[in-house]
Swiss-Prot record:
Modification sites for Phosphoserine: S236
Keywords: Glycoprotein, Membrane, Phosphoprotein, Signal, Transmembrane, Transmembrane helix
Segments passing through the bilayer: 190-210
Cited function: Endothelial sialomucin, also called endomucin or mucin-like sialoglycoprotein, which interferes with the assembly of focal adhesion complexes and inhibits interaction between cells and the extracellular matrix.
Record's protein name: Endomucin
Modifications the protein undergoes after translation, according to the UniProt entry: Highly O-glycosylated. Sialic acid-rich glycoprotein.
Segments on the Cytoplasmic face: 211-260
Originating gene: EMCN
Membrane topology, from the record: Single-pass membrane protein
């Protein structure tokens, strides 16, 4: 519309210069502003008829509703009903002469911290390793272009946990991971000191053996033939024996002289 107004403003001087009133009247008559306003009201009603406290929350249908209307406004109503037999979404409109193209998506959010309690005669058994789920088939009813024809049905499975919740399973997995990490830490705290002690002991043994060999080689008085006495002691013994023999020979010679 703005482009048309700008072009008209540019064309007006040229039209005035030509002094053609008939052309001006035709141009003014050709400018017709058409405004189409479409108002859509979608009241959403939810009715849950179940004796079950489930962790599912029915949210309003989210999607894009595109209406191709050229004449008048349209009033449409969307109802969301959930019963035991299934889930149905129906769209109704006031006008029956217009075509409707609607895309409705239903999202169901599951709460992880909620626990479903079923009113049944069966005994409840909670296990932390397995989760039992029940599936409730649902259907979405979408009308075609003509309201007299039946719409297409598409099934939507809804899973509801019965006995255990997802938070309990996550808690058990976290406990297992914590226990495994604690055991690994205990093993590492035991193994590392043992390995360090073995390394220190082997190094100390090698050092002591080396020091002993160095001291044994540096000592000159150690005999190599297995005798306990050193060479200096042997020489002193030889000198003593020579002296005693010489004294004895001198005494014998003196005694012989006296006898003569």
């Amino acid at each position: 519309m703005e482009l048309l107004q700008v072009t008209i403003l540019f064309l007006l001087p040229s039209i005035c210069s030509s002094n053609s009133t008939g052309v001006l009247e035709a141009a003014n008559n050709s400018l017709v502003v058409t405004t189409i306003k479409t108002s859509i009201t979608t009241p959403n009603t939810e009715s849950l008829q179940k004796n079950v406290i489930t962790p599912t929350t029915g949210t309003t249908p989210k999607g894009k509703i595109t209406n191709e209307l050229l004449k008048m406004s349209l009033m449409s109503a969307v109802t969301l009903t959930s019963k035991d037999e299934g889930l149905k979404v129906t769209t109704t409109d006031v006008r029956k002469n217009e075509s409707i193209v609607s895309n409705v998506t239903v999202t169901i959010v599951t709460l992880p911290n909620a626990v479903s309690t079923l009113q049944s005669s069966k005994p409840k058994t909670e296990t932390q390793s397995s989760i039992k789920t029940t599936e409730i088939p649902g259907s979405i009813l979408q009308p075609d272009a003509s309201p007299s024809e039946t719409g297409t049905l598409s099934s939507i499975p809804v899973t509801i946990p019965e006995n255990t919740s997802q938070s309990q399973v996550i808690g058990t997995e976290g406990g297992k991971n914590a226990s495994t990490s604690a055991t690994s830490r205990s093993y590492s705290s035991i193994i590392l000191p043992v390995v360090i002690a073995l390394i220190v002991i082997t190094l100390s043994v090698f050092v002591l053996v080396g020091l002993y060999r160095m001291c044994w080689k540096a000592d000159p008085g150690t005999p190599e033939n297995g005798n306990d006495q050193p060479q200096s002691d042997k020489e002193s013994v030889k000198l003593l024996t020579v002296k005693t023999i010489s004294h004895e020979s001198g005494e014998h010679s003196a005694q012989g002289k006296t006898k003569n």
